[in-house]
């Protein structure tokens, strides 16, 4: 159903694009016909002194100007339509699995010192970040990366994001529009340095410059009017014109330096202005989203200030024409006025500009988190439990990075203690742990989770799942795992809630040492403030419950049909009674019948 919605949006957008292309062709044809006709009418009318032809030429000139303006507007709409198609394709990629080839995977945000980043596929190829990311700006991407944490931080902010994301889920078309407008920005756009420049205050010398510009521009205007209409001498306006032009040339290096930010982001200013207007008109009236958008309305309204700044940027850009530079500066000291007005704008709205850009960065995070609800039929907002002991309850939980139609939902009802999971190779043990861990990360970010219900006590997630040798550091797989488990034990001394996920504990050593070490590690990690999940092929660990340790057992099964091994990937209570390693060895041709 959700996929069908985005397919319909894509089809409608393709029809719109086709219509716009036809309109573009008509505009090009009309301009091609009108311009020479206008030129011919004006020239011929002037030659033969025919007022009617001159009027026709004037009408065609006006028509040509209108056609150019409409054509430019259509080109902007065509670019936005292309962005719509790209965004819609991104949503559809989440249903087909093609999202795993998207370039922005957040690999740079993953840290080796944070094992969950790799173990739970938070960053990197085929990761939570890659699936979610709707951010175009650098600030938005950094905020999203910071939100995807295995450690609960500010639950008040998490709940606020949940409420804001819930509001976005009601408006999927608005989400597409916002993403499409954001997609027009340069990839990885970073505006922090620019925001700092915009916030610089007006200097006292610029106040003097502003006064100079007003005085001498007024003097030239009055002298010109006096010479033109009162019979005065043209020497004075000519002198003032040359004087003003000389002043403008003298100030040119400083003018260039002061107006440089406008030149760098003239296009971005227009794009941000359209984004802010879309946000102001958006039907997002909830308290949480109102708090996010508040900086757009106070102390300075973003759209009003941005519109003025865009106009100023366009005025500053006109200086690049040499003829305009000479005429405008000789008559009006154009450069000085632009510089002074820009400085005044910075005083009035410069400090607020950084806040506007932060609003968009936060909206990009919310659009990213809403991706789960837009693309998964089964999803829910998690409930955070305020309980003294850790608890995690989930129904129909699936991993986000596996297609929903192929993922097998599983339940979890976990409290303080240890769950030992046994099962054959490829039966789903590791995926089950990752499902719980990754959904916990989504919960802390403020996103919906892939489950029909999900409730948990806020707890730090510690993992030991995907371990490899560190040749440069001289650390073996076994020793790397020891270091991770040591960190778990050190953190456990704080008495804070923990979710501990260990896959195939101590796999890097011989079976005798592994069993002894695993039994001791499980004893020390079975705590009243921790939920510990351990997968293993060592059935001896299933007997810890008989020794008074609060350990429960669960398992995954397989069954055989002819020469095929099949899994249902459903977790069951109790210990596993089957193995499949020898069967897999025979299937691979390594072991004979």
Please identify what each model-predicted range represents:
Residues 1-424, 431-460, 483-484:
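Alpha-helical coupling/stalk and coiled-coil linker elements that connect catalytic or binding modules
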Residues 68, 369, 376-593:
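ATPase nucleotide-binding head domains, primarily ABC-like/P-loop NTPase cores
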């Amino acid at each position: 159903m959700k996929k069908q919605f985005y397919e319909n949006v894509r089809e409608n957008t393709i029809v719109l694009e086709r219509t716009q292309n036809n309109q573009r062709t008509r505009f090009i044809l009309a301009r091609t016909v009108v311009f020479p006709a206008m030129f011919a009418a004006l020239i011929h009318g002037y030659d033969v002194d025919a007022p009617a032809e001159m009027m026709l030429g004037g009408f065609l000139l006006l028509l040509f100007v209108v056609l150019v303006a409409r054509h430019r507007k259509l080109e902007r709409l065509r670019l936005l339509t292309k962005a719509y198609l790209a965004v819609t394709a991104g949503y559809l990629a989440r249903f087909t699995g093609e999202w795993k080839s998207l370039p922005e995977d957040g690999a740079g945000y993953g840290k080796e010192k944070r094992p969950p980043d790799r173990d739970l596929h938070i960053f990197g190829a085929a990761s939570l970040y890659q699936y979610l990311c709707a951010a175009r700006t650098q600030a938005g991407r950094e905020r999203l990366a910071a939100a995807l944490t295995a450690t609960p931080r500010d639950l008040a902010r998490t709940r606020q994001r949940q409420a804001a994301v819930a509001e976005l889920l009601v408006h999927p078309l608005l989400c597409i529009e916002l993403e499409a407008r954001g997609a027009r920005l340069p990839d990885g756009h970073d505006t922090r340095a620019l925001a700092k420049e915009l916030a610089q205050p007006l200097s006292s010398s610029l106040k003097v410059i502003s006064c100079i510009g007003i005085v001498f521009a007024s003097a030239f205007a009055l002298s010109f009017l006096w010479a033109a209409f009162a019979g005065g001498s043209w020497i004075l306006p000519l002198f003032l014109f040359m004087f003003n032009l000389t002043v403008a040339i003298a100030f040119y290096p400083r003018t260039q330096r002061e107006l440089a930010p406008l030149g760098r982001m003239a296009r971005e200013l227009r794009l941000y202005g359209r984004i802010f207007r879309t946000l102001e008109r958006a039907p997002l009236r909830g308290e949480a989203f109102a708090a996010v958008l508040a900086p757009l309305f106070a102390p300075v309204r973003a759209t009003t200030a941005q519109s003025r700044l865009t106009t100023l940027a366009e005025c500053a850009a006109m200086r690049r024409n040499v003829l305009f530079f000479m005429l405008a500066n000789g008559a009006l000291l154009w450069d000085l006025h632009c510089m002074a007005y820009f400085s005044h704008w910075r005083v009035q709205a410069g400090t607020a500009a950084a806040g506007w850009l932060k609003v968009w960065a936060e909206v990009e995070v919310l659009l990213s988190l809403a991706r789960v609800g837009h693309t998964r039929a089964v999803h829910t907002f998690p409930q955070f439990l305020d309980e003294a002991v850790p608890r995690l309850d989930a129904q129909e939980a699936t991993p986000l990075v596996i297609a929903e139609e192929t993922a097998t939902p599983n339940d979890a009802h976990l409290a303080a203690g240890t769950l030992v999971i046994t099962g054959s190779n490829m039966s789903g043990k590791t995926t089950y742990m990752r499902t719980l861990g990754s959904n916990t990360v989504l919960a802390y970010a403020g996103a919906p989770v892939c489950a029909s219900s999900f409730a948990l006590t806020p707890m730090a997630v510690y993992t030991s799942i995907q371990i490899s040798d560190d040749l440069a550091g001289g650390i073996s797989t076994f020793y790397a795992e020891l270091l991770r488990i040591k960190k778990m034990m050190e953190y456990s001394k704080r008495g804070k809630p923990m979710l501990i996920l260990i896959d195939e504990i101590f796999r890097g050593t011989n079976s005798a040492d592994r069993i002894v070490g695993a039994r001791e590690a499980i004893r020390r990690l079975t705590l009243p403030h921790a939920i510990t999940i351990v997968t293993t092929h060592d059935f001896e660990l299933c007997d810890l419950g008989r020794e008074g340790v609060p350990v429960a057992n669960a398992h995954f099964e397989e069954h055989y049909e002819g020469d095929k091994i099949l899994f249902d990937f459903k977790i069951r209570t109790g210990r596993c009674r089957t193995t499949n390693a020898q069967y897999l060895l025979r299937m691979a041709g390594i072991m004979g019948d």
